């Protein structure tokens, strides 16, 4: 069935979330679904998440701006749950506009969005350097410290830029606090008040036309019959509450975060699409039960894992870091399905498995001699998980570009069918290549 033949109901909302440790291919799927939406919303995270789009063979990486910006006429929203670096935002806008993309007339930023300031970046990088071998693996872009300030109620918001005297007063108070940490604890240079003030206020006039009451706009858009697509960043297993803590990001990456992070009611979320790769990857530190390959760990150097990393081009789109690779972990996937209330799955990068003699699927674990069928909550327990695998015959035929389920190799269909069975939820979409058209549609998220 072609996407163009689908009759889409108006005024529906779909949330796209990653079900693994991020890098599941959400950007491509959001781009595909945007053909059926009038607005795309970012509701958490910052410019630590890169969404890679391949459109007509051209690669675009978006870090802050919703993927819908590549579709003329689609409104794009940055919700209050995001932490915003104006410097990163305008760099991204400049790159897009240089490529002929209209951004500023279609981008709307919540007035309540928390700002990332230079001292957040300095603290983030200083902490990671101090941790040494025990580092968490942050991107060093100030995301975590910005969220800390938000929760501590000392964060500066976008709307504060439009009241310069108040902004300056609060900035000075914040710098008194953070510079003490920087100089006395982390042993790095202080951040200059005047330079920071001048830089941040210089963004105010450029930001102002885009700043608005996003929650109200989303409500009005739905009321007028517009479909909205909520674009999650990172993945469920990196969620600050539900991930492999403390090896997590600083925000809630689950579907429920769309309500608080964009200002919409829970009943407005009609369908939750969980994105999962046909195998698993992870960047940075933290437990990974089905791991096969880690460039930094001599004990994890299996050839098949390196092949997955090489064929799958598994390098971070923002950091450039090599990703750790492993077999698909359905026990972890089930945890994500439960937390998010996933309606259906989209399996990405199936083509990376082409040509393998056999494919394995982690269906549970042995932990301290006991069988476990769901990813544990604590990192120490996850680190003790020994994977229990089911093994499937591989397929030699190429799946690249296939657009119909029945045209997939029989062994690929058997693998996907078993994933559905063990996960307990249908696979509604399958991605068979990086281009938006290389997609199999089984159920349409905006139609279900």
Swiss-Prot record:
Disulfide bonds: none annotated. InterPro entries: Adenylosuccin_syn_GTP-bd, Adenylosuccin_syn_Lys_AS, Adenylosuccinate_synth_dom1, Adenylosuccinate_synth_dom2, Adenylosuccinate_synth_dom3, Adenylosuccinate_synthetase, P-loop_NTPase. GO terms for molecular function: adenylosuccinate synthase activity; GTP binding; magnesium ion binding. Keywords: Cytoplasm, GTP-binding, Ligase, Magnesium, Metal-binding, Nucleotide-binding, Purine biosynthesis. Its main location: cytoplasm. The keyword Cell cycle does not apply. Pfam families: Adenylsucc_synt. It catalyses: IMP + L-aspartate + GTP = N(6)-(1,2-dicarboxyethyl)-AMP + GDP + phosphate + 2 H(+). The keyword Isomerase does not apply. It is found in: Cytoplasm. Homodimer. Plays an important role in the de novo pathway of purine nucleotide biosynthesis. Catalyzes the first committed step in the biosynthesis of AMP from IMP. This is Adenylosuccinate synthetase. It comes from Paraburkholderia phytofirmans (strain DSM 17436 / LMG 22146 / PsJN) (Burkholderia phytofirmans).
């Amino acid at each position: 069935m072609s996407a163009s033949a689908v009759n889409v109901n108006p005024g529906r909302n779909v949330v796209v979330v990653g079900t693994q440790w991020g890098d599941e291919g959400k950007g491509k799927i959001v781009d595909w679904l945007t053909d059926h939406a009038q607005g795309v919303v970012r509701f958490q995270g910052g410019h630590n998440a890169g969404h890679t789009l391949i459109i007509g063979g051209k690669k675009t990486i978006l870090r802050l701006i919703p993927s819908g910006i590549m579709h003329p006429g689609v409104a794009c929203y940055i919700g209050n749950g995001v932490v915003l670096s104006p410097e990163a935002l305008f760099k991204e806008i400049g790159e897009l506009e240089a490529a002929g993309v209209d951004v500023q007339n279609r981008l709307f930023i919540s007035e309540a969005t928390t700002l990332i300031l230079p001292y957040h970046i300095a603290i983030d990088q200083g902490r990671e350097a101090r941790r040494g071998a025990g580092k968490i693996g942050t991107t060093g872009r100030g995301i975590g410290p910005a969220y800390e300030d938000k929760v501590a109620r000392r964060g500066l918001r976008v709307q504060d830029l439009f009241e310069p005297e108040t902004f300056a007063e609060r900035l000075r108070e914040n710098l008194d606090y953070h510079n003490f940490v920087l100089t006395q604890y982390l042993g790095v240079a202080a951040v200059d008040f005047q330079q920071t003030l001048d830089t941040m206020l210089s963004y105010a006039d450029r930001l102002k036309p885009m700043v608005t009451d996003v929650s109200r706009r989303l409500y009005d858009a739905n009321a007028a019959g517009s479909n909205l697509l909520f674009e999650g960043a990172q993945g469920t297993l990196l969620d600050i509450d539900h991930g492999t803590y403390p090896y997590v990001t600083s925000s809630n990456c689950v579907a429920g975060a769309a309500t608080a992070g964009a200002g919409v009611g829970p009943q407005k979320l009609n369908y939750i699409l969980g994105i999962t790769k046909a195998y698993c990857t992870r960047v940075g530190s933290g437990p990974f039960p089905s791991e096969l390959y880690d460039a930094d760990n001599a004990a994890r150097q299996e050839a098949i894992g390196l092949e997955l990393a090489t064929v799958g081009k598994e390098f971070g789109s923002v950091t450039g870091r090599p990703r750790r690779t492993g077999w698909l972990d359905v026990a972890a996937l089930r945890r994500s399905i439960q937390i998010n209330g996933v309606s259906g799955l989209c399996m990405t990068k199936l083509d990376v498995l082409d040509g393998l003699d056999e494919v394995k699927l982690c269906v549970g674990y042995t932990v301290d001699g006991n069988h476990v069928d769901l990813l544990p909550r604590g990192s120490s327990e996850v680190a003790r998980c020994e994977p229990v695998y089911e093994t499937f015959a591989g397929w030699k035929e190429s799946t690249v570009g296939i657009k119909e389920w029945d045209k997939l190799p029989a062994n690929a269909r058997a693998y996907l069918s078993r994933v559905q069975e063990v996960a307990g939820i249908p696979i509604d979409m399958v991605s068979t290549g990086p281009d938006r058209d290389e997609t199999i549609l089984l159920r349409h998220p905006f139609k279900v």
